[in-house]
UniProtKB/Swiss-Prot annotation:
Name this protein carries in UniProt: UDP-3-O-acylglucosamine N-acyltransferase
GO BP: lipid A biosynthetic process
Keywords, in A-Z order: Acyltransferase, Lipid A biosynthesis, Lipid biosynthesis, Lipid metabolism, Repeat, Transferase
Recorded family membership: Belongs to the transferase hexapeptide repeat family. LpxD subfamily.
Organism, as annotated: Pseudomonas aeruginosa (strain UCBPP-PA14)
Pfam families given in the database record: Hexapep, LpxD
Keyword Oxidoreductase in annotation: no
Amino acid sequence: MMSTLSYTLGQLAAHVGAELRGDADLPIQGLATLQEAGPAQLSFLANPQYRKYLPESRAGAVLLTAADADGFSGTALVVANPYLAYASLSHLFDRKPKAAAGIHPTAIVAADAEVDPSASVGAYAVIESGARIGAGVSIGAHCVIGARSVIGEGGWLAPRVTLYHDVTIGARVSIQSGAVIGGEGFGFANEKGVWQKIAQIGGVTIGDDVEIGANTTIDRGALSDTLIGNGVKLDNQIMIAHNVQIGDHTAMAACVGISGSAKIGRHCMLAGGVGLVGHIEICDNVFVTGMTMVTRSITEPGSYSSGTAMQPAAEWKKSAARIRQLDDMARRLQQLEKRLAAVTSSGDASSDA
């Protein structure tokens, strides 16, 4: 049976620096949406489309901006950014188990590996020769940490994460189950139709405060390291090929695929299913919408898309048929433009006479 986490509203207000409008002693035992929250839960209004649920919400208190709070008769925590405040408070109610320091008896740790005494190594984990595990790191069951790999302080690896050899991970990095970091890049040379493997002798370097989702793969570099900057957030099932570079605080949604040696700038956002060809660059502050195929470098900040938007199937079939006729339509248009130009030129000559 789970124990109940409980804070007073005053404690929560102090945690996020909120203006409290209501009873500071009100007990709060969780977070919930405006529609689902009860009297012992805190909710928030961050998206205007949910404002319609505010008057009827049963939440014990609501995180609101000053503008929304002025028209609200209930208990509120007034903040500049309700969503950011919610993000901060969510950690107070997080029930993720905290592993105790120490090495499980079934774990296999090389004699020359370094594991900080405050780190936790789970059941059947393997830590190979020369690896270094920093202070407060939590390594889940069945993880493999390859030779000479380094995990910075405060890192958290869910069960069954695999780090190959010579992977360097910064501080406070979270990696979800099934992720594989440092696998061999897809590199081959062709000799008369036969593929000859190229040894991938680079590594992977990951900065601080990075999050890597379940079943995401980051390949090691062919020569130099694949580089992931500070604060990068990677969703589940992302594929990052060898020698890719990702700038600080860039975020990617699920199923993004990035080909080798592509370089992505800082503060970019790639929505789900985006694909990048290799050896191109994306500048800072670029947003790429879902399922876009990026085939050339992007040199100006902004939002980019490719493909066609969803439409009813019957209309899409008509559009697809018209696409097949574009070449013929373009030729006919050129012919009409030439005839129009000839008629216009003839008319001008007649008026001059």
